[in-house]
Amino acid sequence: MTAEVEPHSLLAAFKERMRIFHNGEDNNLSKMLESSESAILSLVGSKDYADPRVRELILERARYAYNDQVEFFYQNFQGDLMALSLENYKLEEKHD
């Protein structure tokens, strides 16, 4: 039996988007969301996901991971990832 994982804060939104109405996959989904959050925040240079565009990318990457297609996420969302990365880079540059 696997250990219980703290439900990710985007779990309900992800389940609604994916039309998942049971709780049997909650641990696995929370782990996918956690790894997606880590990957996206690292890629775009953000510290949190208050920006709705960042949350959207986290949900989309988790969707690709859920469907075992995560390798296609980066190609399909390259423009969004680059735009946010550059925006965050400029914001950090202004504070120096």
Regions found by a protein language model. Name each.
Residues 66-87:
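C-terminal structural segments of small proteins and small subunits
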Residues 59, 63-67:
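Mid-chain, structured segments of secreted extracytoplasmic proteins
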Residues 1-60, 87-96:
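Conserved short "hinge" loops at termini or chain/domain junctions
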